Amino acid sequence: MGMKQLYIFFKSNHISFLVITIFILVSCYGNVRLFSQPVRVGVILPLFEDSEDEAKKQFGTEVLNGIKFSLSEYYQSHGRDVFLDVRDSKKDIETTVNVLTELAGNDSIICVLGPIYSNELAESADIAFMNQLPVISPTATGDDLADTHDYLFQLNPSYDIRGRIMADYLYKELKMRNFAIISEESYGVNFADHFETEVKKLGGNIAAYETYKRDAKNINDIITELHKVILENDLFINPSNMNLKQREKLERSGVRYGLLDSLISQKTNVSIYYLFGRNAKKIIDTLNIKPYQLKSDSVKFIQGYFDVIYIPISNPSEIGMIVPELYSNGLNYFIAGTGDWNNEKALDENKVYMKNLIFESEYYLDENSPQLKELRSRLQKTDYTLDKSFLFGYDSMGLILHLISEGGTTRQLMYNDLLKVSSYDAVKSKITFDRKRVNSELNILTYDHGLKRICTY
């Protein structure tokens, strides 16, 4: 067929040719967003729109502000092809179920951001599954939610993940083996039980596990129990009772002169494990120094049997009750905690009582981050406040909009793309969904004249 005949064929059959072309494109690129079609994102938050109590409205409003600001930034570079359908849960399970059912019935809704609370998310599971609708909670931390219900996603790591991550970090990265747990008895145990299970799975030893009531005024009874464990298992020496030759041996074996001098002047019994670690017995034998166990009434000593004390609190106010008592009883050498320790004011008030502290948290602001600096600059032109609640909304909406821009414009495409999210750089933390659809990234933080991030783990 010559060029003239080919031209006549295409001209006379241009409609058929166009249809065939579109069919081929759709067949080959069915998952690609060929045309900019508007999509809707459902939002379910405790807004208490019919209440005059501003305190009740604050949290949900701040999260919504973050969502709206993230969307406004998206509009600047992508145009207005994404819309919100915002519903008020009133922090009520029945209301949550009703509004989610309504959203699920609208085919233009490709996913739902919210609800906020774990009990609300649990009741959303069947609706999400039956309608194949991704339901993404920015805050829920409960166990057995996303990991046991398809189409649910948790951007906030669960109790299970938090407990396991701290155990993994302490055991694998810091090489700790002997652990004590002091846990608040109703909320803290959600973390502590998973921590205990993971430590044992790794081969570590939970030498003590004690709990306290949320309204406790002190932990004297717990201190007594920890002392019993120490006195039964720890071995001590007292450099003030040694001759010069023995002291020189200690110094040559790696004991710092400043520490040795302090132990001598204060006549302190010190654990050989504190000085030499897990190989202490072997080292102390080569020095021809005999360690001993302390008597039951001994008070003044530095223990080394516990590598770390893991303390899942229920409120930052408990820090001021626990840490000074640990300090007074020589048990403050190394403390590990949960995200509730992420309170700079409480830590600053108790900094004199802490030597080494690490804890996990889903929230950390890196002031050197260009991403954070740019966000602060943009927010100066608005009435919004950059806080934790705002970022729960901003980061979660940012992830959804990122996936939409990459082609996740239907429920199934959004679901598939969410499953692949790995090391997404949100402002307050990274986001990686594990195979159970729960974010498995946490900041490992410490406190040393201010909060500092050690790593993301």
Specify the residue positions occupied by each region the protein language model found.
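Extracytosolic ligand-binding ectodomains
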Residues: 2-10, 15-457
